[in-house]
Amino acid sequence: MGNNYEINIVHLYPDLLNLYGDRGNIACMEKRLKWRGIDAKVHMCTNQDGSIDLKAADIIFVGGGSDREQEIVCSLLIEKKEELKAYVENGGVLVAVCGGYQLLGKYYKTANTKIEGLGILDIYTDAGDTRLISNVVLECEKFDQPIVGFENHAGRTYIGENHTPLGKVKFGNGNTGDSGYEGVIYKNVIATYLHGPLLPKNPQLCDLSLIHISEPTRHSLIS
């Protein structure tokens, strides 16, 4: 039986951004909350119903998609840009994977076009000549266990000095293929190229996100 509080998870545009079963990340959050007696309600923000109530959001998830789909989603979210940025700056929890990771930055530049990002993170992405495809193992100082996943991206993402990489690449390519690092942690944002899905493969990363949501959740996750 659940407690008398409920966690609201907002899934941004799963109809457009859902590569490699990214929906599994939502299922993982729901399950790990349920195991601790915490109810979760998932709000799907889709291309058909794009209403977003960020004031009610405890956690936001955005998955991966093609360049074309990223461009569509960015155009749909642009009017919410400042609200999303305020959500992040005020400690809102956000998990972004692959295309969602790129979308949070300043821009994604391909050979033919430049897709303006939401500018929420101090990152930018340039397309490379080849795709970076590999299983990935990361060393993260926050955890005893490595972070694992699968990457498949043409973008090379460069992060600003005020952002911390998610982890050090022990196997695979990472953000640029040669930086030695993968992903970004900024405030309560986790952004990464890793599929898997990410959170079922790395429950410690899921709990790191959930623990920042609210005081009741924090106590349940720690206990």
Features from the language model and the residues they span:
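Structural motif
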Residues: 59-63, 95, 193
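Extended, subdomain-level signal for the structured scaffold at the beginning of enzyme domains
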Residues: 1-70, 218
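Single conserved hydrophobic/aromatic residue that forms the stacking wall/gate
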Residues: 211-223
